[in-house]
UniProtKB/Swiss-Prot annotation:
The keyword Membrane applies. The lineage of its organism: Eukaryota, Metazoa, Chordata, Craniata, Vertebrata. It is found in: Cell membrane. The keyword Transmembrane applies. This is Vomeronasal type-1 receptor 53. It is a multi-pass membrane protein. The chain crosses the membrane at residues 21-41, 51-71, 94-114, 135-155, 184-204, 239-259, 269-289. GO terms for cellular component: plasma membrane. Glycans are attached at residue 159. It comes from Mus musculus. Keywords: Cell membrane, Disulfide bond, G-protein coupled receptor, Glycoprotein, Membrane, Pheromone response, Receptor, Transducer, Transmembrane, Transmembrane helix. Putative pheromone receptor implicated in the regulation of social and reproductive behavior. Belongs to the G-protein coupled receptor 1 family.
Length: 310
């Protein structure tokens, strides 16, 4: 029997995964609510606020889908049919890919927004949101096509006893693909993800280099009156770098665990750990925005104050 089929017996993994999903859903919901309220309350809303709300919505949908899948992993209330398996697994894989795309494009949009007037990126500022939206839609279509094989490789197979079938949930299993089909889908996905991470690193490096030059110029002009307080641009760049570094570390760790899982024949512990690691970014990233953006912090404080005074 496939070892991952025993995943539902691990209470610690069950508690950890459901806790992660619950916290992530709550944090992303708060972030979406805060940004939507600020967008509705401002005369000229910033494009970055709209995109962060959309970014959080993507992560919220990912965690909700993962929560539904986790229910069938640990406490199945009824066996799913093949259509339910294929739809939920496909949606989950699509949202995971869109999270990578949204993270990359958020870094690019932030870089364009914070770039100085003398930068070559200035010409993209007025239409940056439109360009980012078009790029996201294009990547969405790509992910939908690259993940289409799941509709033929995911089946409802409750009594999993064959070694060549890979466990997904208590109801769903993955049929092994031929080497040609596997390569046909995995190679384009690997290239696309490498390009997105490379673009993310390039945008982060650009902002670090720009702020380093800006700091040197400020030190040259104001050697005797330097302020230790970080500027909004510096705080935003720190947020970018923190999110990007955290995402890349988790992405690499996810790949390492995945290959280890394949090597050790799909062990239940590695499978559970991989699920937790792959959804950690969606849970932690909203807290980074909430803690680093003063506008969100002040808004949440004012909301709490109003609730207390009622």
């Amino acid at each position: 029997m496939n070892k991952a089929n025993l995943l539902h017996t691990d209470i610690n993994l069950k508690i950890t995964l459901f806790s992660e999903v619950s916290v992530g859903i709550s944090a992303n919901s708060i972030l979406i609510f805060a940004h939507l309220c600020m967008l509705l309350g401002e005369n000229r809303p910033k494009p970055i606020d709209l995109y962060i709300a959309f970014f959080s919505l993507t992560q919220l949908m990912l965690l909700i889908t993962m929560g539904l899948i986790a229910v069938d992993m640990f406490m199945p209330w009824g066996r799913w049919d093949s259509t339910t398996c294929q739809s939920l697994i496909y949606l989950h894989r699509l949202l995971r890919g869109l999270t990578l795309s949204a993270t990359c494009l958020l870094n690019v949009l932030w870089t364009i927004t914070l770039s100085p007037r003398s930068s070559c990126l200035t010409k993209f500022k007025h239409k940056s949101l439109q360009h980012i939206s078009c790029a996201f839609l294009f990547l969405c279509v790509l992910y939908m096509s690259f993940n289409s094989h799941l509709f033929i490789s995911i089946i409802a197979y409750p009594n999993l006893t064959l070694e060549n079938f890979m466990y997904v949930t208590q109801s769903c299993s993955l049929i092994p693909l031929s080497y040609f089909r596997k390569s046909m889908f995995s190679i384009p996905m690997a290239i696309r993800e490498a390009l997105l991470i490379g673009l993310m690193a390039l945008s982060g490096g650009y902002m670090v280099a720009h702020l380093w030059r800006h700091k040197k110029q400020a030190q040259h002009l104001h050697r005797t009156s330097l302020s230790s307080k970080a500027s909004p641009e510096q705080r935003a760049t720190r947020t970018i770098m923190l999110l990007m570094s955290f995402f890349v570390v988790l992405y690499i760790l996810d790949l390492v665990i995945f290959h280890s899982r394949m090597k050790f024949k799909d062990g239940s512990i590695l499978y559970g750990v991989q699920i937790i690691v792959s959804h950690s970014y969606a849970t932690v990233s909203p807290f980074v925005f909430i803690c680093t953006e003063k506008r969100i912090t002040n808004f949440l404080r004012s909301m709490c104050g109003r609730i207390v005074n009622i």
